[in-house]
From Swiss-Prot:
Lineage of the organism: Eukaryota, Metazoa, Chordata, Craniata, Vertebrata
Name listed for the protein in its UniProt record: V-set and transmembrane domain-containing protein 2-like protein
Positions of disulphide bridges: C62-C142
PROSITE patterns from the UniProt entry: IG_LIKE (PS50835)
Lineage: superkingdom: Eukaryota
Biased composition (Basic and acidic residues): 188-198
Biased composition (Pro residues): 175-187
Keywords: Disulfide bond, Immunoglobulin domain, Signal
Entries under InterPro entries matching the protein: Ig-like_dom (IPR007110), Ig-like_dom_sf (IPR036179), Ig-like_fold (IPR013783), Ig_sub (IPR003599), Ig_V-set (IPR013106), IgSF_V-set/TM_domain (IPR051102)
Pfam families: V-set
PANTHER family: V-SET AND TRANSMEMBRANE DOMAIN-CONTAINING PROTEIN, V-SET AND TRANSMEMBRANE DOMAIN-CONTAINING PROTEIN 2-LIKE PROTEIN
Signal sequence region: 1-24
Domain spans labelled Ig-like: 41-158
GO CC terms of this entry: cytoplasm; extracellular region; membrane
Length: 204
C-alpha cells in the first residue's frame, strides 16, 4: 500500500509544480484564455430603394463602422450613376450587403456628388436632394474608403431612386395643325353686275 501512495503523491507534486510554472509565465492582469475577436467593418445604416414625385425632397442615409478601435482615416462619398439598374438582379447587392474591392467598377457614367473625411472609427453622411426632377432618377452609391490596416479598402452600398410625375404636373399634348384659311368672300362689284344683267333680261 505504501508504494502506490508514494507514486500518487509524487504525481500530485509534479502536477502542482506544472500549474505554478504556467501561472508564472502568464502576464499579470490577463485572463487564462483570450477569446476576443476584433469586429468586422460594416454599414450600420444603408440607403434603400425609393420612389418620389417630381418636386419632392429626398434624403438617403449612410453610416459605416470601421474594423479597428484606434482612430484612422475614413472617407465617405456619394456617387450618382445615371439609370444604372442592372445591379437590381444581383443578390450580392442586398441593402445590407457589404462589398469590399480594391478597384472601383470602371466604364459607368458616374458622377461624384459629395465627399466627407474624418479621423476615427465611425463615419456617416446623409445625401439630401431638393425638388427632385425626372433627370435625378438613377442609382445612388455610398462609397467608403477605409484605411484601418494601412491600405485603402473600398466598401459600397447602393439604392435606386425612381421619380414619378407630380400631382400638379401639366400634361403637354401635341398641338393640332392649324386650320385651312376660309375662302375670301365674293367682291361686291360682281354681284351688282349679275343683278343688272338679270334685270335687263326680264325687261326684254
Amino acid at each position: 500500500m505504501g508504494a502506490p501512495l508514494a507514486v500518487a503523491l509524487g504525481a500530485l507534486h509534479y502536477l502542482a509544480l506544472f500549474l505554478q510554472l504556467g501561472g508564472a509565465t502568464r502576464p499579470a492582469g490577463h485572463a487564462p484564455w483570450d477569446n476576443h475577436v476584433s469586429g468586422h467593418a460594416l454599414f450600420t445604416e444603408t440607403p434603400h430603394d425609393m420612389t418620389a414625385r417630381t418636386g419632392e425632397d429626398v434624403e438617403m442615409a449612410c453610416s459605416f463602422r470601421g474594423s479597428g478601435s484606434p482612430s484612422y482615416s475614413l472617407e465617405i462619398q456619394w456617387w450618382y450613376v445615371r439609370s444604372h439598374r442592372d445591379w437590381t438582379d444581383k443578390q450580392a447587392w442586398a441593402s445590407n450587403q457589404l462589398k469590399a474591392s480594391q478597384q472601383e467598377d470602371a466604364g459607368k457614367e458616374a458622377t461624384k456628388i459629395s465627399v466627407v473625411k474624418v479621423v476615427g472609427s465611425n463615419i456617416s453622411h446623409k445625401l439630401r436632394l431638393s425638388r427632385v426632377k425626372p433627370t435625378d432618377e438613377g442609382t445612388y452609391e455610398c462609397r467608403v474608403i477605409d484605411f484601418s490596416d494601412g491600405k485603402a479598402r473600398h466598401h459600397k452600398v447602393k439604392a435606386y431612386l425612381r421619380v414619378q410625375p407630380g400631382e400638379n404636373s401639366v400634361l403637354h399634348l401635341p398641338e393640332a395643325p392649324p386650320a385651312a384659311p376660309a375662302p375670301p368672300p365674293p367682291k361686291p362689284g360682281k354681284e351688282l353686275r349679275k343683278r343688272s344683267v338679270d334685270q335687263e333680261a326680264c325687261s326684254l
